[in-house]
């Protein structure tokens, strides 16, 4: 699980805690201090062809990422950014938090619809199709999910 997902459902900044421990501080909480609340989903918004997962280099002409309650977007992207064809194709990590899985899926659909990226191909259409897919909605997913649902690739 990505640290960002864990942070949204526990309320603890894991990176900050890791840095503090690395500096010699004692961990300021115990396992029993950690409670889980709600459900979180993260979509990696990569500059890639959503059918073949090959990089899509180019200039971002426009980009807008949603914000608000239950939404977190970690990004370095901005209009004019030159997405290289090598290295990591990640443009943003889009996360949502909801009271339960159904609420989180609903919020992610809205967040994906409110995200705008032009100038490069990206994975938003794939993520949107996944959010509508029955097995995903039912939580029936494995590491072979995409292999088992090739129709999602477009």
Region annotations inferred by a language model:
Residues 1-154:
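ATP-dependent carboxylate activation and anion-phosphoryl transfer catalytic cores
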């Amino acid at each position: 699980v990505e640290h960002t997902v864990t942070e949204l459902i526990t309320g603890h900044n894991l990176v900050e805690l890791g840095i503090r421990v690395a500096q010699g501080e004692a961990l300021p909480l115990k396992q029993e201090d950690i409670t889980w609340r709600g459900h979180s989903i993260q979509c990696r918004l990569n500059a890639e062809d959503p059918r073949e997962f090959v990089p899509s280099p180019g200039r971002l002409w426009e980009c807008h990422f949603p914000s608000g309650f239950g939404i977190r977007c970690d990004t370095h992207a901005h209009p004019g950014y030159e997405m290289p064809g090598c290295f990591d194709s990640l443009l943003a990590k889009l996360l949502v938090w909801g009271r339960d899985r159904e609420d989180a899926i609903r919020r992610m659909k809205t967040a994906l619809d409110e995200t705008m990226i032009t100038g490069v191909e990206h994975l938003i259409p794939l993520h949107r199709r996944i959010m509508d897919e029955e097995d995903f909605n039912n939580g029936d997913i494995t590491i072979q999910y995409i292999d088992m649902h090739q129709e999602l690739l477009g």
